[in-house]
């Protein structure tokens, strides 16, 4: 970042410069190198980037009993640890190693929790992202141990050198790029779960994917591209990328918080989700708090990528489990109620696209009226049919008014070119929405309502008709009826008709939507009246 550089800009400490030593006895820990008496020598202590002293681990018997540190080296170490922020305890090896280990343990625990969740199977994306984050932290721990082992063999330990080893690893940077992108998509997945309308889910999907790709592309440019010292892009892009991540974290936390506040009455009524709701509200602000700490604290910046993965992992797994708990409570509530779940106007129009609300008797009247040359009879029948249709399909017409774009448009013979263009546009749009719904339903495991459909409508003229004779408690034997009663009985059966989509149409519907979802639509063409005696009513 342009406001904070990870490079050491401090002056060279005196102990890190070349020191002229007087005559004396030179003793080496190497057994092949014998002790020698020298009259003059030049000594240079091992320092980080030849400017900052490091912790000496050669505390043997010779150093403790017979010889001590050089006075200038001892004074330099005292100044470095007492007056420099880089020499504080936070930058030593122990806090760094503990921070990495704790982050790895948290990530592994969340991964095990997701994989072993037997109540509601998590999505493939969630399992993949948590598994990759665990692998990322595992590789980080292994690299840290190897680097500390190398430093120990050289006789020095330094936390900042460990920072450089982790941050400069190409393999870790590539894995971090993939893991953070998947975790950001998981956040989009959780936001989609709190919306009920399919249109809102699609909009969230497109906006979230675009924001995630933009954020990670900017991060990749700032991480893998080397900017010159006088390049303005090297100062602007890191700051802008950081602002994008902060904005995404704030939007995610705000949307989840608003949804929790809207459903606070249901949450208060169910004590089982109090704890996980509190954890969700607190932990979703983890990335925001981390970004603030990252800007204000240079030590957090050194481990920013590791902490970023952990905070993303936490604010994804916990809200996902909260959504599972909340959805199970709402499903139980809907089962206890009479009305079930809510239907929206776009869903009502989706149902009407199948022409399942069209009455067969009205269709017969319409066909007969077209063939009849009597204008007065046609006007009366059409007026009666239109009144019946308006009474039964008021709701579906409201959906039609709000979704006129789905209705087929008829063009004249001179406008065949426009008709083909419009038909191509319609089919392309349906295919695109169908693919999007498949990705949402399968890849992101977002359940959708059974009435949402993006394929070609099924024609009502190809439907099979079944008589629901068993709906009436009292059925007279047709053999015992007169001709007039039998005719009334047939008319009653015609009115009590349930229409099902044919097997081929259901198969096409299943292929165009989700394979694991049963798309069975049952609607009555007329109001079904169950015969009952006066005493029973």
Swiss-Prot record:
Topology versus the membrane: Multi-pass membrane protein
Top-level taxon of origin: Eukaryota
Record's compositionally biased regions (Basic and acidic residues): 381-391
GO biological process, one term: cellular response to pH
Transmembrane stretches, start-end: 95-115, 128-148, 165-185, 204-224, 248-268, 273-293, 298-318
Acidic residues bias (residue ranges): 362-380
Chain residue ranges for the region called Disordered: 362-410, 472-495
Extracellular side: 1-94, 149-164, 225-247, 294-297
GO-annotated cellular components: plasma membrane
Cell compartments where the protein resides: Cell membrane
Cytoplasm is among the record's keywords: no
Cytoplasmic compartment residues: 116-127, 186-203, 269-272, 319-537
Keywords from the named record: Cell membrane, Membrane, Transmembrane, Transmembrane helix
Major localisation: membrane
Signal peptide (from-to): none
Family: Belongs to the palH/RIM21 family.
Main function: Required for the proteolytic cleavage of the transcription factor RIM101 in response to alkaline ambient pH.
Protein name as annotated: pH-response regulator protein palH/RIM21
């Amino acid at each position: 970042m342009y406001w904070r550089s990870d490079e050491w800009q401090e002056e060279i400490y005196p102990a890190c410069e070349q020191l002229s030593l007087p005559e004396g006895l030179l003793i080496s820990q190497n057994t092949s190198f014998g002790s020698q008496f020298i009259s003059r020598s030049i000594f240079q202590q091992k320092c980080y980037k030849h400017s900052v002293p490091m912790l000496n681990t050669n505390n043997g018997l010779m150093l403790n009993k017979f010889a001590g540190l050089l006075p200038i080296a001892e004074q330099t170490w005292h100044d470095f640890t007492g007056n420099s922020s880089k020499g504080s305890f936070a930058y030593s090896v122990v806090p760094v190693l503990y921070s990495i280990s704790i982050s790895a343990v948290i990530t592994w625990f969340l991964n095990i929790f997701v994989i072993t969740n037997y109540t509601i199977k998590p999505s493939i994306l969630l399992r993949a992202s948590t598994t990759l984050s665990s692998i990322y932290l595992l590789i980080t721990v292994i690299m840290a141990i190897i680097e500390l082992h190398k430093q120990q063999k050289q006789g020095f330990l330094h936390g900042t050198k460990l920072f450089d080893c982790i941050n400069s690893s190409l393999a870790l940077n590539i894995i971090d790029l993939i893991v953070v992108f998947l975790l950001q998509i998981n956040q989009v997945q959780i936001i989609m779960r709190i919306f009920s309308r399919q249109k809102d889910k699609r909009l969230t999907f497109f906006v979230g994917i675009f924001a995630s790709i933009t954020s990670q592309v900017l991060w990749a440019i700032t991480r893998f591209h080397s900017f010159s010292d006088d390049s303005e892009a090297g100062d602007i892009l890191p700051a802008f990328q950081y602002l994008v991540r902060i904005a995404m974290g704030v939007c995610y936390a705000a949307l989840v918080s608003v949804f929790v506040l809207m459903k606070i009455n249901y949450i208060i009524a169910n004590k089982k989700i109090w704890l996980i709701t509190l954890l969700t509200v607190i932990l979703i602000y983890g990335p925001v708090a981390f970004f603030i700490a990252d800007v204000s604290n240079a030590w957090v910046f050194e481990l920013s990528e590791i902490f970023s993965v952990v905070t993303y992992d936490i604010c994804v797994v916990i809200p996902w489990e909260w959504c599972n708990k909340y959805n199970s409570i709402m499903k139980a509530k809907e089962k206890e109620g009479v009305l079930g779940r809510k239907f929206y106007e776009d869903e009502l129009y989706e149902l009407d696209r199948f022409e399942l609300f069209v009455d067969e008797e009205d269709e017969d009247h319409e066909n007969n009226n077209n063939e009849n040359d009597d204008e007065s009879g046609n006007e009366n029948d059409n007026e009666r049919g239109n009144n019946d249709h308006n009474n039964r399909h008021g709701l579906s017409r409201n959906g039609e008014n709000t979704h006129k774009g789905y209705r087929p448009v008829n063009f004249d013979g001179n406008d065949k070119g426009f008709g083909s263009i419009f038909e191509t546009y319609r089919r392309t749009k349906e295919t695109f929405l169908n693919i999007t719904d498949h990705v949402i339903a399968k890849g992101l495991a977002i359940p959708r309502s059974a009435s949402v459909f993006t394929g070609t409508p099924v024609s009502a003229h190809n439907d099979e008709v079944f008589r629901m004779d068993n709906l009436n408690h009292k059925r007279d034997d047709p053999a015992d009826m007169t001709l007039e009663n039998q005719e009334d009985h047939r008319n009653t059966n015609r009115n009590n008709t349930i229409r099902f989509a044919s097997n081929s149409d259901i198969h096409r519907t299943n292929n165009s939507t989700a394979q694991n979802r049963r798309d069975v639509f049952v609607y009555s063409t007329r109001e079904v009246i169950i015969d009952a005696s006066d005493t029973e009513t």
